[in-house]
Amino acid sequence: MLELKNICFSADGKQILKDINLRIDDAKFIVITGPNGSGKSTLARIISGILTPDSGQILLDGEDITALGITERARKGISFAFQQPVRFKGVTVKDLICLASGQDLSTADACQYLSEVGMCAKDYIDREVNASLSGGELKRIEIATVMARKTKLTLFDEPEA
């Protein structure tokens, strides 16, 4: 369970978030919507540890994680999927899924993650994660890597971008 208590954040003298309170129970799918510039991405970056709030508290399963950085939060089971997936020259799709899972997965297991996001695994498993892939293909591969991580909480920034 994730809980935010009175989260505030400012940048360049402008208040972006003010007294945000939110509770997300386990096994829930939550969507936060709003116009451009309303603070959605900022909130996701604060939860993931990329940004630090000016004030407030972030609790994960009752533990205060406010002072923890992105690496420590990732170890506790929080993952973040960026609006623009990263491309990796020289890294295959299978390599990326294995890295995400923390295991040396069989090709069949890695392919299963691709199949779950609607991709024909045999067409992608050995391809490099580079500029030859479209934005939509990269996004699906990124979602497959998120699934391979098996985290407690996954934050998607503009998942349909």
Residue ranges, per PLM feature:
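Conserved structural motif at the start of ABC-family nucleotide-binding domains
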Residues: 2, 17-19
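The feature captures the beta-strand-to-loop junction immediately N-terminal to the Walker
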Residues: 33-35
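Helix-to-loop junction immediately C-terminal to a conserved catalytic motif
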Residues: 48
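ABC ATPase NBD coupling module
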Residues: 64-79
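Q-loop/switch helix immediately C-terminal to the Walker
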Residues: 84, 90-109
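Hydrophobic anchor residue at the start of the ABC signature
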Residues: 143
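ABC ATPase C-loop
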Residues: 146-147
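Catalytic Walker B motif of ABC-type/P-loop ATPase nucleotide-binding domains
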Residues: 154-158
